[in-house]
């Protein structure tokens, strides 16, 4: 006997229900790269993403899942042996740290409570202790999908600045993109 459990629907990180109009739009045939409309659609994506992130800065689209974007950011920004800091906020921060280790990066973690956002004071103190400025990057998960914890990006940016630390702030915003009021603090 087959049990029907109601309407099937796609869940994206969050999970978030996808409206029917979006699902219907996904039923359109894929444009070929040589299609004259492809450039218009692509440019629309770039321009519209600027609105989402409230920026005039350059937008880069990367076709992969979040883990693919992690790997791309790690191998294109850092070199083997570089030191990075990954504050622990849940499964995704730990997975990103594990990937970085596999790519031969030196990973420092800032222990955290999976039920709370990053301890901003602890982050700032950790960076202040890096007097030789060896930490090349600070990797943050904006929203941990499983726990729903959302980290305060403006406060994190302020902590890095207050510590007078040059480490590059890299943010995984897969589960939060489009939900934050503004991303201007990342400039």
Predicted segments — roles?
Residues 10-12, 60-63, 86, 109-110, ...:
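General beta-strand structural signal in soluble alpha/beta enzymes
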Residues 7-63, 67:
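A glycine-/small-polar-enriched, mobile loop at the entrance of the PLP active site in fold-type I
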Residues 118-177:
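Active-site phosphate-binding strand-loop segment of PLP-dependent enzymes
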